[in-house]
Amino acid sequence: MANKLFLISLLCVVLVAKIAQAAPQYAPGEEPSYDEDTDDKLIENDTSITDEDYAEIEASLSQAFGTAADPGRRLGEGKKP
């Protein structure tokens, strides 16, 4: 019983230490600073895609891929005679 109590108290101490380390560290009176993303330029959506581009994409979707043999399987394994 004492072992369980010791283990639970140790886990509580570890949890409190983790929470304390995760908290932001500021000096007394110091204001937190936040990153402002005002320097990033806005990029508009690319509208230069054409019907030909869509046709190429559609054609590529019907092509077979991932047809290599699975090295984890043995031929004939799992088949019943």
From Swiss-Prot:
Keywords: Blood coagulation cascade inhibiting toxin, Glycoprotein, Hemostasis impairing toxin, Secreted, Signal, Toxin. Residues 70-73 are annotated as: Blocks active site cleft of host thrombin in a reverse direction compared to substrates. It holds the Pfam family Anophelin. One of its GO terms (molecular function) is toxin activity. InterPro entries: Thrombin_inhibitor_anophelin. Residues 1-22 form the signal peptide. It is found in: Secreted. One of its GO terms (cellular component) is extracellular region. Salivary protein with anticoagulant activity that inhibits host thrombin (F2). Belongs to the anophelin family. Interacts with human F2 (thrombin); the interaction results in thrombin inhibition. This is Salivary thrombin inhibitor anophelin. It comes from Anopheles darlingi (Mosquito).
